[in-house]
Amino acid sequence: MKNETIRKLVLSAMFAALCCVATMIVQIPTVAGYTNLGECMCLLAGLVLGPWYGFFAAGIGSGLADLLAGYAHYVPGTFLIKGLVALIAALLLRPLLKKGEKIPFWRLAVIELPSEVVMVLGYFGYKALILGKGLSAAASIPNNLVQAAIGIVLSVLLYTALSKVP
């Protein structure tokens, strides 16, 4: 294995663990489940690792958190949704990285918005269609919007700080 591949695998495992821990440690219970800081780590995984490594790190870490927290019925949806959050953020960031320009805070936040729209709609669809909760799944939308906003702000702050490290 090349050193770069080993580095990516180690970082992916670290981000999976960070996604899991950030989801489980800071849990704010709500009627629709819980709000957590895992969203920040999912976005950051995509931005740092790129689309596919980020997809698997975010999906596995977040899915593991759901499993360990007793929400096993959410694991398949969480794996896909959180993986897509990282994948979309990474794909939208890629063209800006190729230009080599400094990316301002607001632009990073805008890049992450589509990922969070997928998260909010993804969980609504999963709860409504797969788990059979119908329109009552809409009750989780405000909670997910708050989680998305917190995730965007924190991940942009962390990414900006990390991008200054050589």
Q: What is the meaning of each model-derived region?
A:
Residues 1-166:
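Loop-helix junctions at membrane interfaces
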